């Protein structure tokens, strides 16, 4: 965590307009420098200078889709770690087709999604309405399919949920940190995508990257727990959100080690 803050990685984000400010703030709080660019005249230049790339498909439109594809291909060519957040991929054919195309041609380093989103990518039926997932358990059969998916594509898959699941096809981990209130705040999953991009941006070594990804997932959950513990009587979700971002800006390795609930498989 401290090393990330000293390095201040530059993170290029092509994201949705619902959570764009929150993603920028989370990136700053976790020690990075956010930059959002979609104009084709500057896209190549900015992507090449970045330490990490995040593509979030929450609010798709044609120009953004083209920008996302251009940036992802540049990241692939230059060896820049990239994260794809296929928000609501289960909701429409457009999202499914675009996600499959950018995964095939852009080869992201990591895919992060809730269980409904990830099940859609691996070809399973999901329980959802719109972009909201109502999946609450991850079967061993689905776990094995996710591992195979990650291994075949040489990437990390992060499945967010009550228990988060992370795998690169060879190593896997479950994280039990977090609180139900995080699911009631718009964009906590998107914000996790920013943290994961930061986690990847520091290390070149695959094993170190995997451990840093697991740490980022656990850290975000711990921040949620601490944010909830700070709530007073009659303080609701907006105070919780403020506390969540606040905790991310002050959390340290000692607190993470004391509170992390990680099981490696």
From Swiss-Prot:
Q: Which residues bind ATP?
A: 112, 160
In its UniProt record, a GO molecular function of this protein is: ATP binding
List the cofactors: Mg(2+)
The cross-references to InterPro entries, in alphabetical order and at most eight, read: Hyethyz_kinase (IPR000417), Ribokinase-like (IPR029056)
EC id = 2.7.1.50
UniProt KW keywords: ATP-binding, Kinase, Magnesium, Metal-binding, Nucleotide-binding, Thiamine biosynthesis, Transferase
Function recorded in the entry: Catalyzes the phosphorylation of the hydroxyl group of 4-methyl-5-beta-hydroxyethylthiazole (THZ).
- Protein name, per record: Hydroxyethylthiazole kinase
